[in-house]
Amino acid sequence: MLTKLFLKKKFEEYYSKNEVELPRKFKNREFAFVPLELLPDFVMHRHISFRSETDFRAYILSNVPAHIYFSSAYYERPAEDKMENKGWLGADLIFDIDADHLPVKAQSFEKALEMAKREIKKLTAVLRADFGIRDMKIYFSGGRGYHVHVHDEEFLSLGSAERREIVDYLRLNSPKIVVEDRFANSNAAKRVLNYLRKKLEEDERLTSKLKIKPADLKKEKLTKKVIRAVEKFDYSALSIYIDAPVTADVKRLIRLPGSLHGKTGLRVTEVEDIESFNPLKDALAFGDEAVVVKVARKLNLSIGDFSGKIYPGRVKLPEYAAVFLICRGDASYDS
């Protein structure tokens, strides 16, 4: 109980002192909240809308949330309980890269964030180069990954089927590169072929290994040698491991920028420069005032300016580190 009271006080202080970034056309969005006081039960209160920023701030200060979400969709009546009565008007295109969904599992929180960063860089490069997307924002999720919000008008009206095609293109789900003796005419196949052609042009050793040349990939009718080479080439480095259901869902709830992630105490933070961004420094929401916590097991922790081993028992930590461990369930508040 003491730990929850401490956490509620800290979250309330954060929201009283900091502005939270309301989404575009927020009056047409559904909001959802997980009350902190109900933790560890994850109880979501949803189908909520706001007419003003003042109303929103009053709500979160009187109902301190552990998590805040908003809908990717725009609605005529966002507060309606039944989805079919909301009046769907369109939805932002959302991408979620979470370290938990990557094929290689990280051994630490820090490594997970590094892996997610590499993946988000691949994603945004393809979105710009292949889709011509310019109006998008990158956010650190507050957890183990990143979100991309695309606001380009031409994507707003896409249904789930069209969004799944984008997922297939990015993840290369069964691209069917070769059909009989010709290259498939799908966007995913073209993406793979462009990648292979570029690799062949860059690396003569690959040309020798596969026994084909870049020009062979431009021929209308393919030889068996070219087909075999294309089909056995490893394209895994080209696949981007986005969370498919998030992108395909036209009514998805996504974390609100500027809000706190209840399982880390980190802030959902806009990323201006992905190269230099360090979530364990740049997404800290709390100060460095000393807080005493009780730790149950030996830990290695690197966050903010703190780095080192932590042993079981009473430990004095900077506030941001204490909140992080408490939210993750690795420590309890000890007054």
Curated annotation (Swiss-Prot):
UniProt key word Secreted: no
UniProt-listed InterPro entries: DNA_primase_S, DNA_primase_ssu_euk/arc, DNA_primase_ssu_PriS
GO biological process: DNA replication, synthesis of primer
Keywords assigned: DNA replication, DNA-directed RNA polymerase, Magnesium, Manganese, Metal-binding, Nucleotidyltransferase, Primosome, Transcription, Transferase
Coiled coil stretches, renumbered: none
Signal peptide start and end residues: none
Keyword Nucleotidyltransferase set for record: yes
Single GO cellular component term: primosome complex
Residues of the active site: 96, 98, 243
Oligomer and partners: Heterodimer of a small subunit (PriS) and a large subunit (PriL).
Free-text function comment from the UniProt entry: Catalytic subunit of DNA primase, an RNA polymerase that catalyzes the synthesis of short RNA molecules used as primers for DNA polymerase during DNA replication. The small subunit contains the primase catalytic core and has DNA synthesis activity on its own. Binding to the large subunit stabilizes and modulates the activity, increasing the rate of DNA synthesis while decreasing the length of the DNA fragments, and conferring RNA synthesis capability. The DNA polymerase activity may enable DNA primase to also catalyze primer extension after primer synthesis. May also play a role in DNA repair.
Similarity section: Belongs to the eukaryotic-type primase small subunit family.
Protein name according to UniProt: DNA primase small subunit PriS
